């Protein structure tokens, strides 16, 4: 029995990937497993989906190295910053990196020992990283850097998850213009721009889709969730246990600051999970959890390691299961955020329990691997 844990359903992740492939114009999938696979555990998930995807994408060098050391053999691309020192390590581990600045590329080319596979990052309107269209003359100069082997070029959409397709189409057209110019100058193998939202909503063609949030069964936005262009299965649940149940009287307060006071005699349950585990303090007095198929509202402030809920109308006892985020979209909206943030904030002290074909196949926690089948 586990106390605080994330249950991850491998079968659902695999089915989500196959469903995305069915509707996408691009059959090559790059699985985005940055931020520890959005909090769910990158190395374990990557092992189970490696045969379904063409690439893996991460945010930084340490994430990439972690995948490679764990045994992943498919290509890995870093989407964010890589230092000059880390670039040398990327050569050793066969990790691909983005190039988005000429002087930066020159420093890397001068520093590394051996050849390094790179992808040209293009800024088509997201204004994060990348060469802009008017800087094409600087892109051409990358041809002079003999150690940098240009394998791909990519960009990123800003509003692909919104109903208005105008800006997404503008970005795509800009990407295609640059692509045609690049084809005249380089022998580039892979052009990629589509994210989860673009892959399931937009009729856009490139060589590969980068799928992150949708792979884990979460729609990129409320709008896409309502459209239901594709059936995604949420592949994870955050669970805990009831640690204590007691009755309090009218006027009794709950938790720090006495922000909650009972208006009548009531029953509360304590759950041994708090903001140190990634259950946001912002859920104080507004969050909801599920106990024995009934909703229980958070009472008072969420503590570092514990949270109290109203179970006046729920028959429950110590060790009963608690499901946090019974509706992750609704809970995210309550505190003005998105499911992405709730997922990626899940702390490493939460045990990750992986299930496939109805059985536990792997267990991880911050103390190290506990079980693998």
Can you name each region flagged by the protein language model?
Residues 2-9, 14, 63, 82-84, ...:
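Active-site anion/phosphate-binding pocket segments in diverse small-molecule metabolic enzymes
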Residues 4-8, 12-15, 22, 27-181, ...:
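Active-site-proximal beta-alpha core segment in soluble small-molecule metabolic enzymes
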């Amino acid at each position: 029995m586990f106390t605080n844990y994330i249950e991850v359903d491998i079968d659902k992740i695999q089915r989500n990937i196959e469903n995305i492939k069915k509707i996408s114009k691009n059959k090559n999938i790059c699985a985005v497993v940055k931020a520890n696979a959005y909090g769910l555990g990158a190395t374990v998930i990557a092992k189970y989906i490696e045969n379904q995807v063409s690439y893996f994408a991460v945010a930084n060098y340490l994430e990439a190295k972690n995948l490679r050391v764990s045994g992943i053999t498919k290509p890995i691309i870093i989407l964010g910053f890589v230092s000059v020192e880390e670039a040398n390590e990327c050569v050793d581990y066969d990790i691909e990196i983005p190039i988005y600045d000429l002087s930066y590329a020159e420093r890397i080319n001068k520093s590394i020992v051996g050849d390094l596979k790179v992808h040209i990052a293009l800024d088509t309107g997201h204004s994060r990283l990348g060469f802009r269209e008017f800087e094409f003359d600087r892109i051409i100069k990358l041809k002079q850097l003999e150690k940098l082997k240009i394998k791909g070029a990519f960009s990123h959409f800003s509003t692909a998850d919104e109903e208005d397709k105008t800006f997404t189409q503008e970005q795509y057209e800009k990407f295609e213009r640059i692509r045609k110019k690049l084809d005249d100058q380089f022998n580039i193998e892979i052009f990629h721009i589509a994210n989860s939202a673009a892959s399931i909503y937009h009729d856009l063609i490139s060589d590969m889709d980068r799928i992150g949030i949708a792979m884990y069964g979460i729609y990129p936005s409320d709008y896409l969730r309502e459209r239901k262009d594709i059936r995604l299965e949420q592949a994870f649940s955050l669970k805990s246990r009831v640690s204590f149940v007691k009755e309090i009287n009218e006027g009794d307060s709950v938790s720090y600051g006495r922000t909650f006071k009972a208006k009548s005699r009531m029953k509360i349950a304590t759950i041994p999970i708090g903001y140190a585990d990634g259950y946001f303090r912002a859920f104080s007095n507004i969050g909801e959890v599920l106990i024995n198929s009934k909703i229980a509202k958070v009472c008072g402030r969420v503590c570092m390691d514990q949270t109290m809920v109203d179970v006046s109308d729920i028959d429950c006892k110590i060790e009963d299961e608690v499901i946090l985020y019974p509706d992750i979209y609704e809970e995210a909206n309550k505190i003005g955020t998105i499911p992405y943030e709730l997922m990626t904030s899940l702390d490493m002290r939460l045990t990750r329990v992986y299930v496939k074909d109805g059985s536990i196949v792997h267990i991880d926690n911050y103390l190290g691997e506990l079980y693998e089948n």
